[in-house]
């Protein structure tokens, strides 16, 4: 039996009561209203650190709307490494295009998985895939290979650091790894990958419209990938999204 009578069951009238509150938050009570009021309180009622160090939604020198570019691809990652450019944006007027030469990549979102082939999965081994998000300050020609940029001890990607000659040009912004293991009994043939970074990387193109690495003039974003096992490769199915704002100076 209901605790209160419904409006259409009230005696003496067939009209629905207009005095009732039928808003979605009306039945939650005063506790929810107080919580919402506290979360959405004005800025002057928050601590000073919230007022001093609040990061803007739109990067400085840029304007909205926020544009999104996605890169969906299956990668064959080997011991010698692989590279892809994730700041390739074609010039145009769409929500996935850049208006002019300059734009800012505010954040990068990487999600997907790394996995092994069925034949490799049965072998007893452990394989780690390492990812480097690198900023190329002076891009030219084609992206340099993994072995050209990084210095390794005994050709081991886990010991990779940027060569001294390229420390001013290539800057490692983020680095992470994921691990898979094979075997007949206790195998972990898949590993999920999910990363979200704020980068605020200001990219500059030349006068060309095509979104290619060769058309970059400043601050290209590169993603390097390499696995630690010398003979067993790993596959990576990734979806990489970058969130972009156009520059005001275009």
Curated annotation (Swiss-Prot):
GO terms for cellular component: host cell; host cell nucleus; T=1 icosahedral viral capsid. Keywords: Capsid protein, DNA-binding, Host nucleus, Host-virus interaction, Metal-binding, T=1 icosahedral capsid protein, Viral penetration into host nucleus, Virion, Virus entry into host cell, Zinc, Zinc-finger. It comes from the Viruses. GO terms for biological process: symbiont entry into host cell; viral penetration into host nucleus. It is found in: Virion; Host nucleus. InterPro entries: Gem_coat_AR1, GV_A/BR1_coat, Viral_coat. A motif (Nuclear export signal) lies at residues 95-116. A motif (Nuclear localization signal) lies at residues 34-48. A zinc finger (unnamed) spans 53-70. Its main location: virion. Gene3D superfamilies: 2.60.120.20. Encapsidates the viral DNA into characteristic twinned ('geminate') particles. Binds the genomic viral ssDNA and shuttles it into and out of the cell nucleus. The CP of bipartite geminiviruses is not required for cell-to-cell or systemic movement. Homomultimer. Binds to single-stranded and double-stranded viral DNA. Interacts (via nuclear localization signals) with host importin alpha-1a. Belongs to the geminiviridae capsid protein family. This is Capsid protein. It comes from Bean golden yellow mosaic virus (isolate Puerto Rico).
């Amino acid at each position: 039996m209901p605790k209160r009578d419904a409006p259409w069951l009230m005696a003496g009238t067939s009209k629905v009561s207009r005095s009732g509150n039928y808003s979605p938050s009306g039945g939650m009570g005063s506790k929810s209203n107080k919580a919402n009021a506290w979360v959405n309180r004005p800025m002057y009622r928050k601590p000073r650190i919230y007022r001093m160090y609040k990061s803007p939604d739109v990067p400085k020198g840029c304007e909205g709307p926020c544009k999104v570019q996605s890169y969906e691809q299956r990668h064959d990652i080997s011991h010698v490494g692989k590279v892809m450019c994730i700041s390739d944006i074609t010039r145009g007027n769409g929500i996935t295009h850049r208006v002019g030469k300059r734009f800012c990549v505010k954040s990068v979102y990487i999600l997907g998985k790394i996995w092994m082939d069925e034949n490799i999965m049965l072998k007893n081994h452990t394989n780690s895939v390492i990812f480097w998000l690198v900023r190329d300050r002076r891009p030219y020609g084609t992206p340099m290979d993994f072995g050209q940029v990084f210095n390794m001890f005994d050709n081991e990607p886990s010991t990779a650091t940027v060569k001294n000659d390229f420390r001013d040009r290539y800057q490692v912004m983020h680095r992470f790894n994921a691990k898979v293991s094979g075997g007949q009994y206790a195998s972990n043939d898949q590993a999920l990958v999910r990363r979200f970074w704020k980068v605020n990387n200001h990219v500059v193109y030349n006068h060309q419209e095509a979104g290619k690495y060769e058309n970059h003039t400043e601050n290209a974003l590169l993603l390097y990938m390499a696995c630690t096992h010398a003979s067993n490769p790993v596959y990576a199915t990734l979806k990489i999204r970058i969130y972009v704002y156009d520059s005001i100076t275009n």
